[in-house]
Amino acid sequence: MKAIQAALALGVALCATPLIVRAQADAPPAWAYPVNPPDFKLSPDDGTPRHVPDSTAAFTLTQARDLFFALDWHPSDHPPLPEIVAHGRKPDVMACGVCHRADGPRGPENASIAGLPAQYIVQQMADFKSGARTTSVPQRIPPQLMIKTAKGITDAEIEQAAAYFSGLKPRAVIKVVETATVPKTRVAGWFLAALPGGETEPIAGRIMEVPEDLERFELRDARSHFVAYVPPGSIEQGRQLASNGGNGKSAPCTICHGPELNGVGPIPGLAGRSPSYLVRQLYDFQHGTRAGPWSPLMAPDVINLTLDDMVALAAYAASLPP
């Protein structure tokens, strides 16, 4: 509790200065906000039951794409799913476990919510519902679905989902690799996937986060793993920023998010989470599209960050055990 009070006190002090949100002059980085091309089409379902390693379950592609049916390949990995997580409520409240997976590990296109504080999850749903939390790239479908769901879901359903996901232990599913060259990629459904053939290109200051096994990820296997390619030196640069704020550029992340970035009380942990997602959140905070009640605590800390800073912070956080 003392740590939380200290974090809040720091936030109040920081917020005593005028909050200036950066104008949208610098376009959102396309690699962090992948948008499906106009001709994007899902492969047709031939009705064949699909399988993933270490599971006796079988599902078709149609089932994998059903927004009201959370595929549960590994039911022994977690407690029983609440109805709102497993099936949602038609027509407007999709199953939480579809995008976030049955036990919350997510994909690069959305948030990992396993182990997040219940209070934080409840507040984010309120922010999506009120319009306080949007996105810097409105054409992206994942945040559109969150906003639609938040407007239709009941408080009781939110509490059920928040209690379930907050009680789960997050798992390490990301391998962070510093490299000067990365696989060439394509947008494969609001996320990036490596092109077949092994062609590479310069990383050029980006984070390129891709599934290790594309088919498993598209089948919503919660045990899917990812590789996040980050620029050389970015993890150490991020560690310095997180621990000392870059000599006045920002407040140290560790004050509010904890010494290992695992969170403090209602403040979410960042360790082991998708670096692509983290960059989007930093950018959205900086540009005012994420503006809930706790956002004023973040605004002074992100206003002076460059995109390279965001990449470094996200790379460092993702490299830590959740």
Go through each PLM region and give its residues.
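Short cysteine/histidine-rich zinc-coordinating motifs and their immediately flanking basic loops
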Residues: 107-113, 265-271
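Positively charged n-region of N-terminal signal peptides that target proteins for export
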Residues: 1-5
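Short microdomains enriched in Cys/His and/or Lys/Arg
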Residues: 116-129, 274-285
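Bacterial N-terminal signal peptides
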Residues: 7-18
